[in-house]
Amino acid sequence: MFKENTIKLGIAPIAWTNDDMPELGAENTFEQCISEMALAGFNGSEVGNKYPRNTVVLKKSLELRNLEIASAWFSAFLTTKPLEETVQAFIKHRDFLHDMGAKVIVVSEQGHSIQGLMDVPLFKNKPVFTEEEWEKLADGLHHLGKLAQEKGLHIVYHHHMGTGVQTTAEIEKLMDMTDPELVSLLFDTGHLVFSGEEPLYILKKYLSRIKHVHLKDIRQEVVDAVKESDLSFLQAVKNGAFTVPGDGVIVFDEVFTILANSDYKGWFVVEAEQDPALANPFEYALKARKFIQEKAGL
């Protein structure tokens, strides 16, 4: 289905230890995490809180297991803080990823975000940017995009639950306001379906701008309960809203077909944060790997 040597398969460490709720999977070590990733058949990963920031140490640990770094999340605060604060943190992040050989930087605007707040209802309190904030976001992303390109990297914007860029209309507005040469898109199946969007619409419309893919599935009954009970994003994660591809309600066949018939070249990263005490990370990594092999031939 996919052309040879176009796709690398990664998996996110958030299934082993949750970055937002470090008590979930606190017992899982960095070495266990990356060893199980390799054993499950993945080529690389994104970066978690337990990963060493010393690139010499990190490279050695990964090379022993034939793993690479695909990318790492960056929290921008372009709508709420002075640009220089985000820029300083971004340059450090960019240089780390460049040293690790990554080609994309995952960026998410966290100004007004409620994704990390345990008791704030996800759907009732979703932030909405003002026009002035949209302008700050677009201008700031252009700045970050230029900084990334100085080192041969691209920024990929992560639409995300509980943030100001979550819905179809918000993704479209961001894409309309930004330069395709400077700002690319991260396509995340799980966040789109969770929000009630149509992922194939976004995939088809912005195919040429998508430079990174997160594969995650949704347990619809949990999403329904989140809406009915006014739960937060973190409560949704703890209750199992997300799972690995093939374990929920999302149909991935057309997603894979569209991407296979496109010029997409890069990473598919399985990112399915759930409580590792309830969903053994190694077991679910194996499930995901088997599903991708069966459905995408990868």
From Swiss-Prot:
A GO biological process held by the record: inositol catabolic process
Catalytic class of the enzyme: lyase
Annotated EC: 4.2.1.44
Metabolic or biological pathway, per its Swiss-Prot or TrEMBL entry: Polyol metabolism; myo-inositol degradation into acetyl-CoA; acetyl-CoA from myo-inositol: step 2/7
Family matches, as Pfam families: AP_endonuc_2
Highest taxon above the source species: Bacteria
Entry protein name: Inosose dehydratase 2
Chain's gene name: iolE2
